[in-house]
Structure formats: structure tokens, C-alpha cells
Amino acid sequence: MESSKDTQHGDALESKSCLANRTSSRQNKRTSLSSSDGTGPRVTESLGLPRVLTPSDTAAELGQKTSSSSSSSSSSAQSNRSSKVSLPEIPKEKYPEEFSLLNSQTEDGQRPEWTFYPRFSSNIHTYHIGKQCFFNGVFRGNRRSVAERTVDNSLGKKKYDIDPRNGIPKLTPGDNPYMFPEQSKEFFKAGATLPPVNFSLGPYEKKFDTFIPLEPLPKIPNLPFWEKEKANNLKNEIKEVEELDNWQVPMPFLHGFFSTGASNFSRQQ
């Protein structure tokens, strides 16, 4: 009997020690999971079996808690979203090339030729500074290349046959193909390309090209019709009188008739 009591007492002590170990291990699990960032599953224990919560369950619980507060502030947030929109953070590890375009200055402290900001929403303008025209400290925004060919010069042709200068050589150092001579180097040392203007106090005198002035042309005579007709009749009468000097006696009718008949009869035979 005493041996059976000792065995029962030992079993009870073992069961109590096992329960104590289980409770201590569960408490350690709770503390370790609560100290984490909350991204993994969370173990909750009730009186019965333990329950494991997945991230979807935690998101549902958070959505139920914040639904009431988000509904009240959604209207005000939408009104201010168009005016105040902050750029989201871009990780350098994922997009290294795109992130390098966001730098406003280069390593030497100069502004780059292009500055680009990505368009994350329609309310943000993409280009803030835009294209720069300074290359190595030289302004090249209004320069033209000698090899540049416009559409007018090459329209409808496969070869560039039109010379923009039409074969005229360069006359002066200021005669350059640039739009503005101010951007050319030392343009003021070449002098003026046009002759200077001469101002005088005297009156203006017109100078003729020739010594003989041009005279007005004589008037063309314009006679009436009856005078022209009278002159034509007079010319015809004079011509008829002149032809009388060459007048000849006409041939008699019968003589001519018989002569023509005899000739026709001989031909028929």
C-alpha cells in the first residue's frame, strides 16, 4: 500500500512539473511574438486549444478598428490630396538607375543637362527644371551646326543638292551661321558687318542716274471713223486712175467661144 501511494505522489509531482514547463514556454512565446514587428503569425491561447492568427486575420481586425476613423477623414483627405501629394519613397536597391535621375546636382556641384521626376500621379508635373543649355560652361542653346539640313532643303530629294549659302564664301569673321552673333567668341572685335550711317544737317537732294532727264512720249493720234473712211476712199480712187495706164482691149466673146470649142473637139477625137 505504501509503495502504491509513493508512486501516485511521484506521478502527481511529475504532472505538476510538466504543467509548469508548458505555461512557462507559452509565456515566453507570447513575449517573443509581442516584441516582434507583427508581420508573422500571432499565437493566442484560450481556455481550450490555442489559436494561430494569420496576417489576413490581423489585417481584417485592423480594418474593422480603423473603418470608423477612416470614413470621417476620407472626405477631407480627398480634398487635400490634389493640392498636397508627397512623392513616395523609392528604394535604391530596387531601382538604382531611376533613383539616380532624381539627383538635383551632380558630383561636382553643377546642375545636369536633364532633370527628371517620375510621374506617380496626374497631379504632379513631371519636369521641374527641364533641359539645360550649358555644356561644359558654354551656352549652346542657339547654335547651329554646319552639317544641319532643314526640311525645306531636303524635301522631296534623297540627296542634299541645295547649298544654304549658294556658294558664297565667308566674308567677315562676324558672318557666321549662328542665330545671334553675341554668342560667338569675341564677336565685337570683328567690327560692324554693315557700313556706318552718315548723318547730315543739310536738306536731302535727289540725284539722277543720268544727265539727260526722261521726256514724256508723244501722243498717239486718234482720228474718228469718218475721217479714216474718207482717206481710204481717196487712196482707192488714186489707185484706179494709175491702173488706167496699163489698160488693154478685151477679147471678143465669139472668138473666144469658138477657139475653146475647137480645142475641146480635137481632144475628144
Swiss-Prot record:
Pfam families membership: SASRP1
Modified positions (Phosphoserine) in chain numbering: S72, S75, S82
Biased composition regions of type Low complexity, renumbered to the chain: 67-86
Xref: InterPro entries: SASRP1 (IPR029165)
Region (Disordered): 1-92
Biased composition (Basic and acidic residues): 1-14
Modified-residue entries (Phosphothreonine), positions: T54
Ranges annotated as biased composition (Polar residues): 18-38
Keyword Phosphoprotein among record annotations: yes
Tree of life domain: Eukaryota
Keywords noted in UniProt: Phosphoprotein
PANTHER family: SPERMATOGENESIS-ASSOCIATED SERINE-RICH PROTEIN 1 (PTHR35845:SF1)
Protein name (Swiss-Prot/TrEMBL): Spermatogenesis-associated serine-rich protein 1
Organism of this sequence: Mus musculus (Mouse)
Gene it is expressed from: Spats1
